[in-house]
Amino acid sequence: GTGKVETMDGLQYISGGVGSVGTMNGNAGQFIYSGGTGMINELNSYQQYVNEGCTGIINIMNTTGTQWISANAVGTVVTLKSGTQLIDDGGTGTIITLDNHDGAGGQIVYSNAIGTIVTMLDGEQYVFKGGSATVVDMSGGTQIVRVSGNGMIETLNDGEQNIMGGGTGLVSTMNSGSQVISSSGTGTVDTLNGGTQTVAGGGNGTVSTMLGGTQVVSSSGKGTVNALNGGTQIVSVGGTSLDTVLNSGGTVYLGSGGNISNITYSGGMQIIDNITSGYDNMTLGSGGTNVTMGIISGAQMSGTIINSGGEQLILNGGTALDTELNGGIMQMSSGGIVSGMTMTGGSMVLENIDGGSFNINGTLTANNAVIDMTDSSVTRAGTPAYESLTIDTLSGSGTTFILDTDLAGEANSDKVTITHADVGTHYVQIKDLSKLNNIEVTGEHK
């Protein structure tokens, strides 16, 4: 049979028939058995219980009540603003919109049940003990995946997927928000455009294709990026980067105490921070590793060979020892340390937007190379950031020093000081501010 109640503060039992309630208040409840179907337009009360083989539908759920779905039953909440949809024992539950939730409940999925949220703006989806849960479009809230649970988010625009304790999570496309993996959890992001995957505490995280965003690996976590085409993988104390493929546009940042295992370099940049071993005698560029190496904050590389197409960045606090430059580029920032260098072609570029002092310690052997001190940001009118370079000992011949000058103003210029030099011929090329501003220079200038 069919029964309908407009407003109810009591109990409705449905067995094999169809029952509906317009508004359910107070301690009221709807109980559905024996293949029955129950419908509630607005639930402001206790619960709707959907038993084996039955169907329950709630249009709007406003309170801390519960839709309980079990034993192969099917339940739907069109809009859930408060309360809980609880699915267990093989049941199937769907929330069309989880919106402005008060934080108490959301959707709970376990014991081989299946839960789906089509649009998630707030609240929680909690899955564990063999449950499987999906969010089609997440713009807020949290999907929590625990012991033996499986969670999936098709598109993550904001919010969080939190995986731990043996749970497994997947985000198909992440544009923002976060996936947090710990305590033996396993998480995968198919395409990472933005946001963060954080892996720690024995968790395992994989990004199939990274175009932007960040993967942060620490504290016994293991992280892999199958194609790092953009964005940054950060590996810090206790974390391990495993089998990552670094391509052009991507960056791997390795901090002290972090580990990298079996990385493949196909381009991009790797920055090492406060690491003094493990990066000696690398070949960058043609015939070697196609990657730009950046050295900062107490990190050191020794015996590096930089061929055509290779590049090394010596940033503040970084050290390069006994480097051989054969057609590639070394870029040095103020505060970087270079000692013992051989240049056969190639370029050394000094970069500091505020000017600064640079030193090349030991012997610089430079043949047919370029040392560029110019401020690349200045094309006219503005005053360059003038720099000074001190070389302990200069050897070789045919190298060109390119300097910023101001011959008309005679106010300042780049300066090169050579303490000792072997016999050889080198050249000075100037980028003069007066010339850039079309000011005629006449007479003697020093």
PLM region spans:
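Low-complexity/repetitive intrinsically disordered segments
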Residues: 1-7
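Fold-core signature of tandem repeat domains
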Residues: 5, 12-14, 21-24, 30-32, ...
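Acidic, glycine-rich low-complexity segments
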Residues: 7-9, 15-16, 23, 34, ...
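Extracellular parallel beta-helix/beta-solenoid repeat domains
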Residues: 36, 73, 91, 113, ...
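N-linked glycosylation sites
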Residues: 62, 204, 259-262, 274, ...
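Short, well-ordered turn and helix-capping elements at secondary-structure junctions
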Residues: 131, 185, 203, 221, ...
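Intrinsic low-complexity/IDR segments
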Residues: 271, 279-281, 388-389
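Extracellular beta-strand/loop-rich repeat segments of large surface/secreted proteins
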Residues: 293, 304, 312-313, 321-445
